[in-house]
């Protein structure tokens, strides 16, 4: 058993496969995800886990060099993202999901609580 950090094996594996500039997303429970994109579904019930809980667990695990957020995203979601942010329409964000390596589905019910992250390098 792992001693600390992420415990979900699918999530650990997906993060380990990321390369520089690969994209991945953290999404609310209502975002339509393209069929060909891997979904790591963490949602249990509405509101659990929250976007913030998932993002806080991920921050120590991944290097991020950029993010994409939809115009309608709440300010509190934007404030959680500790990197340069590109703001696009919600339709453009949904289109960019097709290029993501995976999407982490949370139980978040806040509208537009979706962020696409661009992987950086640790060196």
Swiss-Prot record:
EC number(s) per entry: 5.4.99.62
Coiled coil residues, start to end: none
GO MF, one annotated term: monosaccharide binding
Catalytic activities: beta-D-ribopyranose = beta-D-ribofuranose
Domain of life: Bacteria
UniProt entry keywords in alphabetical sequence: Carbohydrate metabolism, Cytoplasm, Isomerase
Pathway: Carbohydrate metabolism; D-ribose degradation; D-ribose 5-phosphate from beta-D-ribopyranose: step 1/2
Cellular component terms (Gene Ontology): cytosol
InterPro entries associated with the record: D-ribose_pyranase, RbsD-like_sf, RbsD_FucU
Residues holding substrate: 28, 90, 112-114
UniProt entry tagged with the keyword Disulfide bond: no
Gene Ontology biological process terms from the UniProt entry: D-ribose catabolic process
Catalytic residues (UniProt): 20 (proton donor)
Subcellular location: Cytoplasm
Enzyme class name: isomerase
Family: Belongs to the RbsD / FucU family. RbsD subfamily.
NCBIfam families xref list: PRK11797.1
Subunit structure: Homodecamer.
Function: Catalyzes the interconversion of beta-pyran and beta-furan forms of D-ribose.
Protein name: D-ribose pyranase
Organism, as annotated: Corynebacterium glutamicum (strain ATCC 13032 / DSM 20300 / JCM 1318 / BCRC 11384 / CCUG 27702 / LMG 3730 / NBRC 12168 / NCIMB 10025 / NRRL B-2784 / 534)
Taxonomic lineage from the root: Bacteria, Bacillati, Actinomycetota, Actinomycetes, Mycobacteriales
